[in-house]
Amino acid sequence: RLGKLPIIAEDLGLLTERVKKLLKRSGFPGMKVLEFAFDSEDSDYLPHKYEENCVAYTGTHDNNTVTGWYETISPETKNYCDEYLKKYLSKFESDYWLPINLRFIDAIWASKANIVIAQMQDFIGLGENGRMNAPSTLGKNWKWRLNEKYITDELCNGIKMVTRKFKR
């Protein structure tokens, strides 16, 4: 906290040891974005590496939705993502055959992160058409709105079930 203001450090991208030490000293939680996790096996964005003092996200407003991301990644990245999630989620008796958006939500909800956040577009399973923002572009940014048709008993029960399952 900074006074009464809660602070989340945007510690994304290349982090030097100096920056990591500064963040640790500050006590502010950092960010863990699961979409960033699958470029290497030692990625700090893999959920089994999350510490409690962090905020875990499926993706951010500047990323594609999970479904949109998954549709555009390379076959190698997709294979690594699938294999990692299968192994990681098996510890929590999660259904590996869920759609990718729900596996991502299960993965961060199961993590040690004190706070977990998923965009509504990821709960719904929208693809590229649900993207909130594409940095350095004009036109369609920040126009997505939750349409009433998506607010279903199935969606509400799904959110309730994952929240209860992982005691969030």
Model-derived regions, located:
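Catalytic cores of glycan-processing enzymes that make or break glycosidic bonds
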Residues: R1-R168
